[in-house]
Each structure stands twice: as structure tokens, then as C-alpha cells.
């Protein structure tokens, strides 16, 4: 008899269990099902299925945070509902500020007029109109030039066109103007000095222009003398007087007829009194000329004669 027929069948060997004691292996649901459940959640406020998963609060899987797109609010599962105001979670686009169209437009006529008027007012503050002239020239006060009256409150230059050829020629009197400028009183004491032109209107106008040009030259010369006196002092006053330029017109206007040698020359009656004023040098020259009248060296041009030459010896 064979021994192989009565052997028992072997028992199956059990598989070893690799589970660690004290721990239990839990099966996680698939991620697809979890995402589907999270997407199917409805908003607890508006019951809108239009929700989305944001993140896990405090990194805890039990507190997922969702956002409702319809009511724009957040909520957390297992937590309190937050009272988030409507529209608080959206980002509003900033509107670009359009440039003001009024800035590009030209100013109106009224604004431009106000602008130019303000400019004129500012310029008048720095450059006031010449109302009065206050010059102190060689001790002569030329204040209140507005009181200058020529031809008895009449204009010196009549620039209006003369239509008729037979119009009467008006005399041009510069006496009051010369009296105010320190050249003597011509209206009261010396009446024959009024310049009267006979002829056409062009001659009258030309003579008046020449008169004013002569006065302008004299005033300019006096200004130069004052500036030279201020710069170099009073020591060079005599030399400056000697270098005085000759004016073009009306320099030797005779005030008193002193051509006769027999008549004594008085102080202040010389023919250039209105030009030089009361100058001490002039008076000395006039008195010297009066004393040397008998010696044949009487000079009427204001230059002192050399009479005392006897003490000089002749050359060998």
C-alpha cells in the first residue's frame, strides 16, 4: 500500500497583516466626488448653486470656505455667516478722469479785456504819466510845469491842417515858457520878444519848432552841467561854463539895448541875463567891461580884456 493516498491536504498560509497597532487605516473618498460636492453646495443665504470653493480656513479640511457669485458673499462650513456687505468682494474699475474741455478753449473776449486792463494798471504803477517835472538845475526850481502857458493859454504848435490860404497868422509867444524855465520874465517886462512870423502857415510852424528845439538844447546842456557838478564837484564849474556849446538859434536875444558905449552897464541888464541867470562870474565880467570903457578895449562878448600888461618886460 502506498503512503501518499492517506496524507492530509495542507492548510492555506495566512497573509501577514502590515497594519500598525493603535492606528486604523481609513479610506478617503476620491477627490472627484469631493469637488463635485463642493460645487453642488448652495448659498445659505440666497440658495443659489452659483458658488465656488475658495480655500480651507485655518488650513483645516473641515472648514472649507466658499463664495457665492450671485450675492457676492463668503461663508464657511461649520462657522458663522459673515455679514459682508453687498459688493464688498468685487474690484471696481477706476474711471479715467477726462480732461476738462474748457481748459483747451481760448479765453472769451471779456476775460481777455480784463487781462489787458490789469496789465495796463500794473504798468501805470511802475511808469506813471509825467504830470509834473521837478528839476533843480543850477539853483533854478522848475516845479509845476503843467502851469506852462504859451500864447495866453493857447497851443504853441497848431498842427491842424490849414484849409484856407488866407488864414490869419497867429504869433508864437514863448515868453511865458521862458519865464517858467528861468530865462527871465518876458511877458511882463520884455514885451518885444514875442516871435511873430509873417508869411505862410509852414513858416509859422517851422519857426515855432526851431524855438522849441533851441530851448530843448539849453535844457539838455543844463542837465549835463548839473551831472558834471555832481561828479567832479564845484571846483570845475568855471571850466565847464567856458566849454559851453553854442546853441543853434535865439542865443543872443537882446533884452536891453546896450550897444551904446556911453550908457553904463547895470547889474542884471546884460544881453544874456535870461540865459545865464544871476551868475557871480557874469557880474564880474560886466563890471570889468564897464570900468575899461575908456581904454579902447571894451568887449561886448563877455570876455575880460587884458589891460594891465605894463609890468611885463619885452623879450630881448
Swiss-Prot record:
Annotated localization: Nucleus
GO biological-process terms attached to the record: guard cell differentiation; positive regulation of DNA-templated transcription; regulation of cell wall pectin metabolic process; regulation of DNA-templated transcription; stomatal movement
GO MF annotation: an example: DNA-binding transcription factor activity
Biased composition (Polar residues): 21-42, 257-291
One annotated Gene Ontology cellular component of this protein: nucleus
ZnF Dof-type span: 41-95
Renumbered residue ranges of the record's region Disordered: 1-42, 92-111, 257-294
The keyword Repeat appears for this protein: no
InterPro entries (UniProt xref): Dof, Znf_Dof
Keywords: DNA-binding, Metal-binding, Nucleus, Transcription, Transcription regulation, Zinc, Zinc-finger
Biased composition regions of type Low complexity, renumbered to the chain: 101-111
Residues that coordinate or bind Zn(2+): 43, 46, 68, 71
Biological role: Transcription factor that binds specifically to a 5'-AA[AG]G-3' consensus core sequence.
PANTHER family for this protein: DOF ZINC FINGER PROTEIN DOF1.4-RELATED, DOF ZINC FINGER PROTEIN DOF5.7
Protein name, entry field: Dof zinc finger protein DOF5.7
Organism lineage: Eukaryota, Viridiplantae, Streptophyta, Embryophyta, Tracheophyta
Underlying gene: DOF5.7
Amino acid at each position: 500500500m502506498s503512503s501518499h493516498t492517506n496524507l492530509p491536504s495542507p492548510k492555506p498560509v495566512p497573509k501577514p497583516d502590515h497594519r500598525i497597532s493603535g492606528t486604523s487605516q481609513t479610506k478617503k473618498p476620491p477627490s472627484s466626488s469631493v469637488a463635485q460636492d463642493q460645487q453642488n453646495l448652495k448659498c445659505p443665504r440666497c440658495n443659489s448653486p452659483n458658488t465656488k470653493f475658495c480655500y480651507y480656513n485655518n488650513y483645516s479640511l473641515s472648514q472649507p470656505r466658499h463664495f457665492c457669485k450671485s450675492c457676492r458673499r463668503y461663508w464657511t462650513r461649520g462657522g458663522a455667516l459673515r455679514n459682508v456687505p453687498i459688493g464688498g468682494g468685487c474690484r471696481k474699475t477706476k474711471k479715467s478722469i477726462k480732461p476738462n474741455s474748457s481748459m483747451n478753449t481760448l479765453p472769451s473776449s471779456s476775460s481777455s479785456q480784463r487781462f489787458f486792463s490789469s496789465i495796463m494798471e500794473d504798468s501805470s504803477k511802475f511808469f506813471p504819466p509825467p504830470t509834473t517835472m521837478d528839476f533843480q538845475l543850477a539853483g533854478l526850481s522848475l516845479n509845476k510845469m503843467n502851469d506852462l502857458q504859451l500864447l495866453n493859454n493857447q497851443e504853441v504848435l497848431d498842427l491842424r491842417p490849414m484849409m484856407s490860404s488866407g488864414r490869419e497868422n497867429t504869433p508864437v509867444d514863448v515868453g511865458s515858457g521862458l519865464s517858467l524855465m528861468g530865462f527871465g520874465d518876458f511877458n511882463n517886462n520884455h514885451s518885444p520878444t514875442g516871435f511873430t512870423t509873417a508869411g505862410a502857415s509852414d513858416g509859422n510852424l517851422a519857426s515855432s519848432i526851431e524855438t522849441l528845439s533851441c530851448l530843448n538844447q539849453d535844457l539838455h546842456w543844463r542837465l549835463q552841467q548839473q551831472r558834471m557838478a555832481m561828479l567832479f564837484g564845484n571846483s570845475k564849474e568855471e571850466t565847464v561854463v567856458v566849454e559851453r556849446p553854442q546853441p543853434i538859434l535865439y542865443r543872443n536875444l537882446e533884452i536891453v539895448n546896450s550897444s551904446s558905449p556911453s550908457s553904463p552897464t547895470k547889474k542884471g541888464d546884460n544881453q544874456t541875463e535870461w540865459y545865464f541867470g544871476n551868475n557871480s562870474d557874469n557880474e564880474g565880467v560886466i563890471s570889468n567891461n564897464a570900468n575899461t570903457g575908456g581904454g579902447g578895449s571894451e568887449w561886448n562878448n563877455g570876455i575880460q580884456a587884458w589891460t594891465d600888461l605894463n609890468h611885463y618886460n619885452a623879450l630881448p
